[in-house]
UniProtKB/Swiss-Prot annotation:
Residues 89-152, 240-281 are annotated as: Disordered. One of its GO terms (cellular component) is nucleus. Residues 325-434 form the ERCC4 domain. It comes from Xenopus tropicalis. Keywords: DNA damage, DNA recombination, DNA repair, Endonuclease, Hydrolase, Magnesium, Metal-binding, Nuclease, Nucleus. PANTHER family: CLASS II CROSSOVER JUNCTION ENDONUCLEASE MUS81, CROSSOVER JUNCTION ENDONUCLEASE MUS81. GO terms for molecular function: crossover junction DNA endonuclease activity; DNA binding; metal ion binding. This is Structure-specific endonuclease subunit MUS81. Mg(2+) 2 binds at residues 332, 364, 395-396. Residues 150-261 are annotated as: Winged helix domain (WHD).
Length: 612
């Protein structure tokens, strides 16, 4: 007899350690919303960012390290905090909401009984909380009828349903499958790995199983877990199998009409597995999406790039024909105190690590697969070994260096360049160096910067206490990567091809695609020659309020300054010039650029006399 059915439950969100700042931001957002001002969205983004961070803030200035906190909001918080101290006294705690507000809030919430359908939220007005369902829930359930959930073809949910269905038809079926069995059998039916995460994401194809359980298509019983189909899941899986068989007969894959896709599975998986990421039921949920994870959602389609693009490698390194080599940036061995710089190299040699010191244009450490070459009779020089770069790059930061890089802006720029370099496993190696209490930035702010890098940017963070421990970590990583890649055939690709190829590393695959090291290192050069479009983008981003997304939206319409100037010249009046860019759609939510920024840009490019 199967045991009791257990369904996945959402983890409780941690309480915000800065409720006073959250309260003030919420008041400002609501006030802006009443006046129909667009600043409400700015406050909403700041609220979302603040709620994701587990550390307390002592001033608005400290909040500047958070995403979506600019000079204006930080100054407003400091001014409001000063007023709060003047009203309540200098010793009043700021990490709790004042009792008067608390009592009022409690009185307003008194009629509401706890219900599993409603989730308390700091941003929900009291009158909305007194209802059983939130407005967003009503919109979903009211009006048109919901369509049946059908997983996308070759997604994690699709593969799991088909695998369980085929198991039920097997004469040796036990009526259930374990997690390991299910992952192994379902992998050939899925384009994503069931065990390894996608680039810049924390989720695997296995996370879709929680969606299947919630939709009552799969049941999970016992411990260790056993998975089997429900009647509803059996019926859906049978239809998927029939569509698959029909597609094979027709010579092309056929897809059952689906009302859902992998984005829905990803959103539900995020809310279950990440306690810091959740959808806001009051304001637009899309604002809550983390930029670090948005790449996968944008590229979701029924077929992955690897199916559409037939990659032909320039060369292939077969198992036994290459060595895994750690590359160390020469900056890590020169400059500063000689004994300190050489200590890392000494420790690596002591640990028996095969490494090479060279100029790296990005990161401090990375790993390559270097071809084994033999001397050719009659030639004086050994042929040059071909090299492929692995998907791991390490940026090493001592606490004092982290402090300096935050102050001069290098920290944000380095993270931006690491995201764009093409290597999908960026690692920040944070090394303690004495006491952080005497640095020019508070220790709590440095800790927030580290959390920010992991939670918002999606980088892996490794903390070490000294150089010796850092060398030990690099040694372990080198051994680990040697074990992974040494048994695989490595196919080369160029920098231009890397986004077209399926470069995911699957444990059961016999080969993987890697970028040539020479192309990668040249492409990562900081001061390489730039195109007119790149310089134009940098120029636009110097204007206050123009973010990378907004600059990219302008470049889609006007790729060069000449094309923008030509558009301005075709305008019949100064007012038309000022409004030329106001309707340009920006970002994931496709909001207008707005008349204020449009006017500022037009003044910059259309004013002939000196700007003052």
């Amino acid at each position: 007899m199967p045991g009791e059915i257990t369904y996945g439950r959402k983890r409780p969100l941690p309480a915000c350690p800065n409720p006073l700042f959250l309260k003030w931001l919420t008041e400002w957002r609501d006030s802006a919303a009443e006046k129909n001002l667009k600043t409400q969205f700015v406050y909403q983004k700041a609220i979302s960012s603040l709620k994701k961070y587990p550390l307390p803030l002592n001033s608005g200035k400290e909040a500047k390290i958070l995403q979506n906190f600019g000079d204006s909001i930080c100054k407003m918080l400091d001014d409001r905090l000063e007023k709060h101290y003047a009203e309540c006294g200098p010793n009043i705690p700021i990490h709790t909401v004042p009792s008067s507000s608390s009592t009022l809030r409690k009185a307003q919430r008194q009629p509401k009984a706890p219900s599993p359908l409603s989730i308390p939220h700091a941003l929900e007005p009291p009158e909305q909380e007194s209802q059983d369902l939130s407005p967003s829930k009503k919109k979903k359930t009211g009006g048109k009828k919901q369509r049946e959930y059908v997983p996308q073809r070759r997604s994690g949910g699709y593969a799991v349903l088909l695998t369980l269905y085929r198991d039920t038809k097997s004469p040796s079926s036990r009526g259930y499958m374990t997690k390991a069995e299910l992952q192994k059998e379902a992998q050939p039916l899925c384009d994503k790995s069931f065990t390894l995460t996608d680039p810049n994401s924390k989720y695997t194809a296995w996370t879709s199983v929680s969606t299947l359980i919630q939709k009552e298509l799969v049941i999970k019983t016992h411990s260790p877990a056993r998975y089997s189909l429900t009647e509803k899941g059996l019926e859906l899986a049978q239809r998927l199998e029939e569509a698959e068989d029909q597609g094979r007969a027709d010579g092309f894959p056929r897809q059952v009409q689906a009302s859902s896709n992998e984005e829905e599975e990803q959103e539900e998986a995020e809310s279950e597995t990440n306690p810091y990421i959740h959808a806001d039921p009051v304001q637009c949920p899309d604002q809550q999406l983390n930029l670090a994870y948005s790449h996968n959602a944008k590229n979701t389609s029924s077929d992955p790039p690897s199916v559409q693009y037939n990659h032909v490698p320039e060369f292939t390194l077969h198992p036994g024909d290459f060595n895994i080599l750690l590359c160390v940036d020469f900056i890590e061995t020169t400059g500063g105190a000689a004994h300190r710089k050489q200590e890392l190299v000494t420790e690596l040699r002591r640990n028996g690590v095969n490494f090479d010191v060279r100029k790296l244009h990005i990161g401090d450490f990375l790993w390559i697969a270097q071809e084994k070459v033999q001397p050719v009779p009659g030639q004086l020089r050994i042929p040059q070994a071909r090299e492929l770069v692995l998907d791991y790059v390490v940026e090493r930061k001592r606490m004092d260096d982290l402090c300096g890089s935050i102050i001069d802006g290098r920290f944000r720029e380095q993270k931006f360049r690491l995201k764009r370099c093409g290597l999908r496993r960026p690692i920040y190696l944070v090394e303690d160096h004495g006491s952080a209490q005497h640095l020019s930035i508070p220790e709590t702010t440095l800790q927030q910067a580290i959390v920010n890098t992991q939670v918002v940017d999606g980088f892996f963070i490794k903390r070490t206490k000294d150089v010796r421990e850092s060398a030990a970590y690099l040694t372990i990583m080198t051994r680990y990567l040697q074990g992974i890649y040494s048994r695989k055939s490595l196919l080369s690709c160029t920098k231009e091809e890397e986004w077209k190829c399926d470069r995911s590393l699957r444990p059961d695959a016999s080969s993987c695609i890697l970028v040539e090291f020479k192309d990668f290192n040249e492409g990562a050069m900081k001061n390489k020659a730039q195109t007119v479009k790149e310089v134009f983008a940098r120029q636009l981003m110097q204007i206050s309020g123009v973010s990378g997304e907004k600059a990219a939206a302008i470049l889609e319409k006007y790729s060069t300054p000449a094309s923008l100037m030509s558009a301005y010249e075709s305008c019949s009046s100064a007012e038309e010039k000022e409004k030329l860019l106001s309707s340009v759609k920006c970002g994931k939510l496709q909001r207008n650029l707005g008349p204020v920024l449009s006017k500022t840009i037009s003044q910059l490019y259309c004013t002939k006399e000196p700007l003052s």
